[in-house]
Amino acid sequence: MVRLTDSEKAEVVSLWSKVDEKIIGSEALGRLLVIYPWTQRFFEHFGDLSTADAIMKNPRVQAHGEKVLSSFGEGLNHLDNLRGTFAQLSELHCDELHVDPENFRLLGNILVVVLARHYGKEFTLEVQAACQKFVAGMANALAHKYH
């Protein structure tokens, strides 16, 4: 289990207060689908995923990316109980959707890249370290049902 210090929690919460979940979520999920094309199999019902441009402009990818990032934002309210908070989502992804839990780690790492791209100088080493721990905690929580 990943534990963030009070300072790390403050870093993530401060950055997150500036995050536009629609923009960042859409870009993060879109990049996941482009960079790791095998993840597209979970989203075939989203329509055209034939090119990077089609993926990044796909309204269903954008909407789901926002939904995913909103869940990450909800995680910030429960940093000390991510597993409990995301138990149902973990169960859904494991038992019904059969998502490879490695995809959660991949998405988290892509999210960190997207945050760095958007927040540049504000995305210091300390912020990056805190964000990496946060997304690792989210990935662990979402993969918990698999263990």
Swiss-Prot record:
InterPro entries: Globin, Globin-like_sf, Globin/Proto, Hemoglobin_b, Hemoglobin_oxygen_transport. The keyword S-adenosyl-L-methionine does not apply. Residues 3-147 form the Globin domain. Red blood cells. Pfam families: Globin. One of its GO terms (molecular function) is oxygen binding. Gene3D superfamilies: Globins. The keyword Transport applies. Disulfide bonds: none annotated. GO terms for biological process: hydrogen peroxide catabolic process. Heme b binds at residues 64, 93. Keywords: Heme, Iron, Metal-binding, Oxygen transport, Transport. GO terms for cellular component: blood microparticle; haptoglobin-hemoglobin complex; hemoglobin complex. Belongs to the globin family. Heterotetramer of two delta chains and two alpha chains. This is Hemoglobin subunit deltaH. It comes from Heterohyrax brucei (Yellow-spotted hyrax).
